[in-house]
């Protein structure tokens, strides 16, 4: 028997759906999500939590002309299913497949690309003001989670939208979580709002009862004069109201009928309005309901993308977290900072072991960097653990608040290089380039997980900014000997060879070693150098390579522009190097989603491609 979902492909198909059929459809969508995402991998919990919310939005608004912006965008699966992309879910987040985030080049229904948090209100406000200036008529809807609302950019946008009274609809999807449990004053404030629902319901009932008689109306009028003076004490929604944004809620984000009623009316409200919906992350799937963080993002059931060697011990994140705990036992001034990512960055155990020395600031990378700077200025040794893609949000603070003052802040940059399935917005391929241009910044990269403890210890002891970059997952080559001693600006000759030297940093060193094994079978034996320091480079070793007549190949999991290879090339040019040189990395383009192995192969950074590049030197 054909399901209801099979007959629905576009927003117009939902318009005449009865309430009972909509309930049936919500169950079918959940089943589809569980079955499909379990096969391909992807964001599950967040999408299970917004099924009814998405259906109600699509029934109440006309997204042929109305525009919607999904904050972060990982919760847009239901919207994608019902905008003609259901069949694409078999290739979700795969190379050349359906994106896990909104993409303007994927569908006319995706009005703005997202991937990072807290951008939706700003983007929606920009669209609304463009609409007004052009004299057009449509509604702009921004959907933002309670976690993303803690981001400073979202609050800046709220301040602006309320000041100008621009007409737009903001949906607060409050599931009481971001990826991990939310923290901070705004999170407590939203809890207060949820608890205030009883008060709001009572207030409505009183007004309805009193308003039925003339005496009651007169009493309401007199009460309102008193109400204004005490309103801020008893109605927590005044936070939004004082910013000039009308607040409605909280309402049940799984009650389609209630949401339809509210959404149909807000289109007529002049000025901005925020509708507070309360949802349950992972709803309809018991495992995800119990552990929403665990099922936030899940791997494919037949996961073959794990290019790291399963025999290798720990992931880089785990190795970092364990090392920091050990160092903190000896160094009492060491503190750890995260921006809403304690689990992903490996700090969960540190938070349990040293709760008073652990600081989760919420989705606030700018604040996290300057918080670390303030701590360092007052004698602490802060370590900020952050994904490469998210550190770029604190770019100015790294320069202005850390590097100019030459403060001893350690940046533990996780997910450096290609991360795979999340695509352009999450690849960590730019940190070397923008950090390299900052005076006083040192950049290092461990060649294996075993090297993290000594490198982290060295970074914390150095009395200036240090960035340690390392990839997602585990090692590809196990049992590499960790450096016994780290010497500032010095590289390591890992394997001697002839004629050509491969200089690689981080995980790319492991690719270089595998490429050497391939080349040995063809009679070529390259020298392998581990660029432990990306900044500064080892000028003495480069001068020796010049004197010994080596050709040079550099490999990095970063864009070429501003990267390690360019730094090496500049110095070789300065010393009149006249050998052959080739730079491997990513060109001036954004790297799409896909299996990590496929992406390395596509961009010439897998061991086979590296060996083929070297063969061309000899042909």
Curated annotation (Swiss-Prot):
Catalytic reaction(s) noted: D-glyceraldehyde 3-phosphate + pyruvate + H(+) = 1-deoxy-D-xylulose 5-phosphate + CO2
User: GO CC annotation: what is one?
Assistant: cytosol
- The transmembrane segments are none
> A GO biological process this protein is involved in?
terpenoid biosynthetic process
Q: Which GO terms describe its molecular function?
A: 1-deoxy-D-xylulose-5-phosphate synthase activity; magnesium ion binding; thiamine pyrophosphate binding
Q: Could you tell me which InterPro entries the record lists for this protein? A: Dxylulose-5-P_synthase, THDP-binding, Transketo_C/PFOR_II, Transketolase-like_Pyr-bd, Transketolase_C, Transketolase_CS
Keyword Iron-sulfur: yes or no?
A: no
HAMAP family per UniProt: DXP_synth
This chain's function reads:
Catalyzes the acyloin condensation reaction between C atoms 2 and 3 of pyruvate and glyceraldehyde 3-phosphate to yield 1-deoxy-D-xylulose-5-phosphate (DXP).
Q: What is this protein called?
A: 1-deoxy-D-xylulose-5-phosphate synthase
Which gene is this protein's source? dxs
């Amino acid at each position: 028997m054909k399901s209801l979902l099979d007959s629905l492909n576009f927003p117009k198909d939902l318009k005449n759906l009865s309430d009972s059929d909509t309930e049936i459809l919500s169950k079918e969508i959940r089943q589809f999500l569980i079955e499909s995402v379990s096969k391909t991998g992807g964001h599950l919990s967040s999408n299970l939590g917004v099924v009814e919310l998405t259906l109600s939005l699509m029934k109440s608004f006309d997204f042929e002309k109305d525009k919607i912006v999904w904050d972060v965008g990982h919760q847009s699966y239901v919207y994608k299913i019902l905008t003609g992309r259901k069949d694409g879910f078999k290739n979700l987040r795969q190379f050349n497949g359906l994106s896990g985030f909104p993409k303007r080049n994927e569908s006319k229904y995706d009005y703005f690309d997202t991937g990072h948090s807290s951008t939706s209100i700003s983007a929606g406000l920009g669209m609304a003001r463009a609409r007004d200036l052009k004299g057009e008529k449509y509604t702009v809807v921004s959907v933002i989670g309670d976690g993303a609302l803690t981001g400073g950019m979202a609050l800046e946008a709220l301040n602006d939208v309320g000041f100008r009274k621009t007409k737009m609809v903001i949906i607060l999807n409050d599931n009481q979580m971001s990826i991990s449990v939310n923290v901070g004053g705004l999170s407590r404030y939203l809890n207060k709002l949820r608890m205030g629902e009883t008060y709001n319901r009572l207030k409505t009932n009183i007004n309805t009862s009193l308003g039925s008689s003339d005496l009651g109306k007169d009493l309401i009028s007199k009460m309102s004069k008193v109400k204004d003076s005490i309103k801020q004490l008893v109605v927590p929604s005044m936070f939004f109201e004082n910013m000039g944004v009308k607040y409605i809620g909280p309402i049940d984000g799984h009650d389609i009928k209630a949401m339809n009623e509210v959404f149909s009316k807000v289109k007529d409200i002049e000025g901005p309005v925020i509708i507070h919906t309360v949802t349950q992350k992972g709803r309809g799937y018991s495992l995800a309901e119990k552990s929403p963080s665990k099922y936030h993002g899940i791997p494919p059931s037949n996961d073959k993308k794990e290019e790291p060697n399963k025999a290798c011990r720990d992931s880089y994140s785990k190795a970092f977290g364990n090392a920091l705990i050990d160092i903190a036992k000896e160094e009492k001034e060491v503190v750890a900072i995260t921006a809403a990512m304690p689990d992903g960055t490996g700090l969960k155990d540190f938070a349990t072991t040293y709760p008073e020395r652990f600081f989760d600031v919420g989705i606030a990378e700018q604040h996290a960097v300057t918080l670390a700077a303030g701590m360092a200025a007052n004698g602490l040794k802060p370590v900020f653990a952050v994904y490469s893609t998210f550190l770029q949000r604190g770019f100015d603070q790294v320069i202005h608040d850390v590097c100019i003052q030459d403060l001893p802040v350690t940046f533990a940059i996780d997910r450096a290089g290609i991360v795979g399935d999340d695509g352009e917005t999450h690849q960590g391929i730019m940190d070397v380039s923008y950090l390299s241009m900052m005076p006083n910044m040192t950049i290092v990269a461990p060649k294996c997980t075993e090297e993290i403890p000594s490198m982290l210890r060295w970074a914390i002891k150095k009395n200036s900014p240090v960035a340690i970059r390392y990839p997602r997952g585990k090692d590809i080559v196990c049992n590499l000997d960790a450096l016994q001693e780290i010497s500032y600006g010095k590289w390591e000759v890992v394997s001697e060879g002839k004629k050509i030297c491969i200089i690689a940093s981080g995980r790319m060193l492991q690719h270089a070693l595998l490429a050497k094994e391939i080349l040995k079978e063809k009679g070529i034996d390259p020298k392998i150098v581990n660029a432990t320091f990306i900044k500064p480079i080892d000028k003495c070793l480069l001068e020796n390579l010049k004197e010994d007549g080596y050709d040079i190949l550099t490999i990095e999991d970063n864009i070429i522009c501003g990267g390690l290879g360019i730094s090496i090339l500049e110095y070789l040019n300065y010393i009149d190097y006249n050998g052959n040189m080739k730079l491997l990395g990513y060109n001036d383009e954004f790297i799409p989603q896909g299996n990590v192995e496929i992406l390395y192969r596509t961009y010439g950074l897998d061991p086979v491609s590296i060996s083929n590049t070297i063969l061309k030197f000899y042909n």
